[in-house]
Amino acid sequence: DWTWDEFADVLIGVKQYMVEQGMCGENDYIWSDMWCGQTSGYGQGGNLLKLLGASYDINTGWAITTNYGLVYDADSDSFVDGSVSDKYKQAYTVLQKLVQNKVLDPETWTQDDDTALNKFYRGETAIMSTNRAQYAVQDAKVKEQLGEGNYELYRILTPIGTSDYQAENQRLECGIMISSNALNALGEDEFIKMMRFVDWLWYSDEGLTLTKWGKEGETYTVTDGAYSLTPGYYCKGLSIGQTSDDQVDLREELGYACGNFMYSGNTELLTSNLPENLRDFYDRHGQYRQLRTPEPAGNPTKKQK
């Protein structure tokens, strides 16, 4: 576990070591991230600024549009403008430190995601953002470029800024919202049937297992509590890589393991697709990070807007 300042110091040391070993030059950067530039950053700094901001209790990057940029302060039960706070200055001071010491590549904010990924695959950079779906792809590509046994990937926790909270506390991430027009369109009896189906599909163990893994015996099996796909399938969305050319992606081919379904359920189901190293990552989250108080519905004043 570490703070952003400590993390920056470690990366400065890693850069120095890589220079000494001839792995990179003084003017090279060892961190050139994806999800921040022209492909998916939307001109807002994307994922990296979102994670950095969450560590300092501010909304920035992808989160800048959340509640008009306002942050919920549970202690005062009010929304505050994080962009004028000392926390905002602290977050961007760390960012400046990383750039000035030639650790974080300024091209992070302008390059496309493929450019960032290819730098990582070739071993030119040492750190990269990831998620459950992307990790299997990244691992396979690094192995293809560098060769098995010539590298090691390790998931780190997002460093601590002014809090040890996990990143997300918004009420909307994955799920379903139903318009009031549905009742008018379907009538009461059919509307009740639909709501019963929705309740089963999104909130029962059986429905969530179906939407995540498919049909037991056909797309997956369970042995001693361990879930695995049948030989004909792989799934990038579950971080289960392709091992033969005749396999098809469970999500792309059949629509299972889609994000709007699969991020809820009991702990056993939530972790059923995780390899050992990712289970360790989640265990460390539970040990070192706290859950934020959920935000109430935002209702900013005209002046705040």
Residue ranges, per PLM feature:
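Conserved small-residue motifs centered on glycine
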Residues: R196-Q304
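Alpha-to-beta junction loops
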Residues: R122-Q134
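Ligand-binding "clamshell"
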Residues: Q138-D164
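Helix-loop-helix "hinge/cap" segment bordering the ligand-binding cleft or interdomain interface
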Residues: D1-G46, Y68-T115, K119, I178-I192, ...
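Short, solvent-exposed loop/beta-turn-alpha elements that line the ligand-binding surface or hinge
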Residues: N59-D86, P159-Q166, T221-D246
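Conserved oxyanion/phosphate-binding beta-strand-loop segments in alpha/beta enzyme cores
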Residues: Y42-I64
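Solvent-exposed loop/turn segments at secondary-structure junctions
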Residues: C36-S40, A133-A136, I160-T162
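Short, solvent-exposed loop/turn segments at the edges of secondary structure
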Residues: N169-E173
